[in-house]
A protein has these predicted regions:
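A residue-level marker of the well-folded mature domains of exported/periplasmic proteins
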Residues: 1-254
């Protein structure tokens, strides 16, 4: 209703971060390439699994909220990489993205699989945290590689501690700046540079919407310094508390 009212008043509409579905009244969609997020996670998991990344492997996939369109795209991206390379023995969609729901899901997977898990595709850092809690409670040692997303502080620290393999960093500042520029151009009738979209569109169920899709970045222990620290997303003081001081030094965080 809000989008329709804006259209009726000749006000441009940008769908920011999440795609508004089933309306042709959008001017632009601006977000990160969410299928690419899932693909980054899938590729990172295969890398971390190494020689275990075979069809005999036991992988658990913990997706996001089934009502969230972004979660659907993350899932598609992950499957585009993992399908045919490993066997996803258990897969869950996690209501509300809640870590406690992910923990319950992982507990069920461990019970079903007899604690044999070679890798966990977790769609974000919250679900990763829930899955890790379940595995610790079950006494899974060593922890299998597990993915994440959002570069949450707790996840960065888990990566340093060796409990989580990776996260996906989405530079919020770059997204906000792109949205501000796009809003300015639309409001003042300035031609939007073709380089912003590079001809990309995303179908929302009603139309192909011109889309600005920013590039997500995989973060592992080796590039925390050059990504989230370099961008000021987290500082050394944030990350390197006493419990993580030696791990920070080893990872070259300054």
């Amino acid at each position: 209703a809000i989008v329709a009212k804006a259209k009726a008043a000749n006000i441009p509409v940008i769908s920011y971060d999440r795609l508004i579905l089933n309306t042709a009244d959008l001017n632009y969609y601006l977000s990160f390439d969410n299928a690419a997020v899932g693909a980054l996670q899938g590729n990172a998991l295969l890398t971390a699994m190494g020689a275990k990344a075979t069809l005999s492997a036991s992988v658990v996939e913990i997706n996001g909220d089934p009502a969230d369109n972004n979660a659907k795209l993350f899932k598609q991206g992950a499957h585009s990489v993992l399908d045919g390379k490993v066997t996803i023995k258990k897969e869950y969609d996690t209501p509300g993205w809640k870590p406690e729901n992910a923990q319950t899901e992982m507990q069920g997977a461990l019970t079903s699989l007899g604690n044999k898990v070679d890798g966990v595709l977790a769609a974000n850092d919250g679900t990763a945290g829930g899955a890790i809690a379940a595995m610790k409670t079950a006494g899974v040692t060593p922890l299998p590689p597990i993915t994440g997303q959002d570069a949450e502080l707790a996840a960065i620290q888990r990566i340093l501690a060796g409990e989580q393999y990776m996260t996906v960093y989405k530079a919020i500042k770059a997204e906000a700046e792109a949205a501000a520029q796009l809003a300015y151009d639309l409001a003042f009738g300035v031609a939007v540079p073709s380089t912003m979209t590079n001809g990309k569109t995303v179908n929302n169920g009603a139309a192909d919407i011109k889309s600005v899709l920013l590039t997500p970045v995989a973060v592992t222990k080796s590039n925390i310094q050059s990504t989230v620290v370099a961008d000021g997303f987290w500082t050394k003081a944030d990350i390197c508390t006493s419990a993580y001081a030696s791990a920070c030094t080893a990872a070259g965080i300054s």
